[in-house]
């Protein structure tokens, strides 16, 4: 019988001291701390504490790491309104013919019909309409800005790295550090942060050990970072995000002789979302995914997960709870806070090996 508290957002809250929110990343990348979740049959006291470099011991030859190769756009754009006031757009996703869905700040100052200019330029934009589903605005950019690849040139020149609001500083180094080392598909407005821990040295070491790497794409957007707005999780809906799971990835998973390990919640969402398009059987897929993963979900593909520590009452916390259970997750978070782990995007990591996953969550056939 499922615990009814698992389906209430208020059950996923926890107190976090402000000083535990990481403002800068670990250097080198693989030196971030890593909490290793104990097996499902063992108590919390069996948790181990190390660093991300320890993945060289935790992963075995034949294991398959699935990473998200999305690249973060410099999607935060300062614009001038016709009266001269300064506003900000967060450029989210293309809607065709140079039209882009954007979040506006302050939103009440930006209405349909308003003409904007990118600050410091003569490049004009027009607010076309409100988007009720996202709370954003549909904005007309130059028509050659039709997709992430074509708008990236403009954003690289005039945009800023869209760091999360809880990182209260600006540093030119973020242009490089807020990207994974394997990011090559532009389109995200937030980094798949678990992947930030993988240095070139760690990736090379894993390859030498015989750990394989497969690359999916999920362009991180509203579906990942938008706050959950309902306490009744049976009614939860998430904004869709664009996903590509290629035939090469499907083949790598089918021939995997070890364990399928997702790097980050976005890799989980991509793989499981693609599988749910085909009745739980993974096939190549390109398109939008809005899958909700929360306690009670039966995983089709993913066997283990490396992830960061997530915000209270977030959809990401629900996803991790689906793997190891809500009560255990919150107990682990309490332990991490007491041991001074660093939280959120630039913070430390958790390693959830397959033996730590709840039996009812394990993929069928593995």
From Swiss-Prot:
InterPro entries: QueA, QueA_dom1, QueA_dom2, QueA_sf. Belongs to the QueA family. This is S-adenosylmethionine:tRNA ribosyltransferase-isomerase. GO terms for cellular component: cytoplasm. GO terms for molecular function: S-adenosylmethionine:tRNA ribosyltransferase-isomerase activity. It is found in: Cytoplasm. SUPFAM superfamilies: QueA-like. GO terms for biological process: queuosine biosynthetic process; tRNA wobble guanine modification. Monomer. Pfam families: Queuosine_synth. The lineage of its organism: Bacteria, Bacillati, Cyanobacteriota, Cyanophyceae, Synechococcales. Transfers and isomerizes the ribose moiety from AdoMet to the 7-aminomethyl group of 7-deazaguanine (preQ1-tRNA) to give epoxyqueuosine (oQ-tRNA). It is an enzyme of class 2 (transferase). Its EC number is 2.4.99.17. Pathway: tRNA modification; tRNA-queuosine biosynthesis. It catalyses: 7-aminomethyl-7-carbaguanosine(34) in tRNA + S-adenosyl-L-methionine = epoxyqueuosine(34) in tRNA + adenine + L-methionine + 2 H(+). Keywords: Cytoplasm, Queuosine biosynthesis, S-adenosyl-L-methionine, Transferase. Transmembrane segments: none annotated.
């Amino acid at each position: 019988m499922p615990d009814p508290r698992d389906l209430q957002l208020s059950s996923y809250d926890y107190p976090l001291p402000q000083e535990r929110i990481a403002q800068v990343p670990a250097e080198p990348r693989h030196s971030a701390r890593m909490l290793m979740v104990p097996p499902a049959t063992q108590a919390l006291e069996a948790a181990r504490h190390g660093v991300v470099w320890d993945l060289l011991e935790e992963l075995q030859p034949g294991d398959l790491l699935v990473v998200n190769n999305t690249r973060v756009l410099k999607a935060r754009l300062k614009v001038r309104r016709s009266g001269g006031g300064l506003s900000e757009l967060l450029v989210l996703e293309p809607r065709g013919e140079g039209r882009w869905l954007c979040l506006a700040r302050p939103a009440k100052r930006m209405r349909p019909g308003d003409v904007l200019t990118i600050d410091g330029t003569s490049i004009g934009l027009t607010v076309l309409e409100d988007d009720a589903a996202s709370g954003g605005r549909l904005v007309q950019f130059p028509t050659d800005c039709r997709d992430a690849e074509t708008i990236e040139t403009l954003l690289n020149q005039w945009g800023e790295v869209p760091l999360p609001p809880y990182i209260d500083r600006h540093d030119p180094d973020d242009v490089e550090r807020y990207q994974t080392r394997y990011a090559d598909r532009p389109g995200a407005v937030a980094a798949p942060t678990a992947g930030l821990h993988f240095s070139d040295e760690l990736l090379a070491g894993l390859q030498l050990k015989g750990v394989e790497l497969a690359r999916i794409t999920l362009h991180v957007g509203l579906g990942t970072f938008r706050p959950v707005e309902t306490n009744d999780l049976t009614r939860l809906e998430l904004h869709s995000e664009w996903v590509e799971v290629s035939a090469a990835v499907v083949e790598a998973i089918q021939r995997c002789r070890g364990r399928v390990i997702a790097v980050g919640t976005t890799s989980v969402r991509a793989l499981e979302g693609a599988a749910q398009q085909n009745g739980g059987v993974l096939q190549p897929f390109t398109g939008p995914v809005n899958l909700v993963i929360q306690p009670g979900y039966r995983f089709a593909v993913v066997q283990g997960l490396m992830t960061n520590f997530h915000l209270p009452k977030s959809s990401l916390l629900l996803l991790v709870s689906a793997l190891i259970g809500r009560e255990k997750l919150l107990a682990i978070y309490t332990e991490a806070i007491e041991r001074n782990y660093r939280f959120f995007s630039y913070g430390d990591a958790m390693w959830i090996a397959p033996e730590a996953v709840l039996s009812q969550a394990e993929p069928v056939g593995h």
